[in-house]
Amino acid sequence: VSFKLARAVRRGLTNGEPLPDVFRSLKDRGIRFYRGGTVLVGGVPGSMKTMFIGHMVDTMKVPTLYISNDTNELDIISRYLARRTKQDSNIMRMKALKDPEWAAEKLSDMDWVRWNFNASPSLEEIEEEMMAFEELWGEHAHLVVVDILMKVDYYEDGGGSLEGIVRYLDKLARDTGSCIIIACHTSENEDGHPTQPLKAILNKVSKLSTLVLTTAYDGNTFYLAPVKNRNGFADSTGYSSIQFLVDPSTAILEELE
């Protein structure tokens, strides 16, 4: 249905609304997460994609749906307890198992995040979860995380299609006004310096997303590179990375700039 722009303004705008900024170094470069579109966060296994996304989720504090098909409940619980106590996540794992009431109380400040831990969710299930979120809370999730792309169950013409999944999720983002962050793998054949270039994103799934970030991890440093950014700075080579101090044991990131 077509309508006048004036009507769109009067009825309220959600698509294009930025989510809260978490890091000044990202905001200064125009790296922002907008509702109504998809964001890809790509890297090789062990490049701290999930830790970065988790930090963003925990700090933004907006209505969130998290599809965690690559990390189980106990690992997630351990990391968020570690962030709150600044103690090693392995210690928090044992603490959560021994004292679940204590762990539940510590995590009660995250009740605005809904979780789905299905190891192989279908696109239909993801859409149903998004609709259920809206029915429960009276509004669509401002942020949806799909972690990770390759474990979403989808078939097109008899074969899997990562591009088809992103296309479907991009439409869902536009229809609901959610920002959908999608974690994905990159090709290990593409060198990183230390972050990989845009072409390292597998299966050309980056075509639809307005923001694509690649990640790397070395020692106590986390690297994040904007290799595609419709609304700010980008360098497709991956050379222009932003550095963060990272403590994997407590899942905490700190800006170095």
Model features per residue range: what roles?
Residues 22, 72-76, 122-126, 145, ...:
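Helical mechanochemical/support elements of P-loop NTPase systems and associated helical scaffolds
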